[in-house]
Amino acid sequence: MRLWSGSSIWLERRPVTAEVASSSLVRIAILKENMTSQIALIFFNLLIVGVIFTHLLLTTPVVFKSLDEASAANFLRSIFPRYYLLIIILSLPVLLILFLYEPSGTLKWLAANVSFHAVLGFLLIPLTNAAKDRGWDKVFSFAHGMSVYCTIVILALSLIQFFLYIG
């Protein structure tokens, strides 16, 4: 019996066989798994973006306006390791999901680069602090510039991933 017809689509009512039912259940299970993975990927990338925006727009300006130079330096020395560790922790589920479920190399490359730049930013912290303490202005400028570069790359790649997942 025909239920509806359009210009090129015909829907028919057919009895459900065991084969059709089992294949439909498998498709539903795969769809739920893919949807859950996609939601997790979107969630973790947006968390990374949120951490960066919070740090750039709220934390840093307030620190320099509210604290003297020595207190600001102490605060930033304690916050930056936590900042990069949080980004590393948030990037790991993205890597895990993509390496388990995603055949595309592009998404894996993007996620690996987010994690790599977070680790690089974390590893630059001792160099940045030592350069500042010893008055090595060129080394400090380079290390600080690399830290800013890492943050920009992480932000850009996380936003790219977000738009790829929702697109």
Language model features: what each stretch is:
Residues 1, 7-9, 22:
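Short, positively charged low-complexity motifs
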Residues 2, 13-14, 27:
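Basic polycationic patches enriched in arginine
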Residues 6-8, 12, 138:
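Intrinsic disorder/low-complexity segments enriched in polar/charged and small flexible residues
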Residues 10, 17, 29-31, 167:
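Residues marking helix boundaries in flexible regions
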Residues 23-34:
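Short, Lys/Arg-enriched N-terminal segments with co-localized hydrophobic residues
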Residues 34-167:
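Polytopic transmembrane helical bundles with strong interfacial aromatic enrichment
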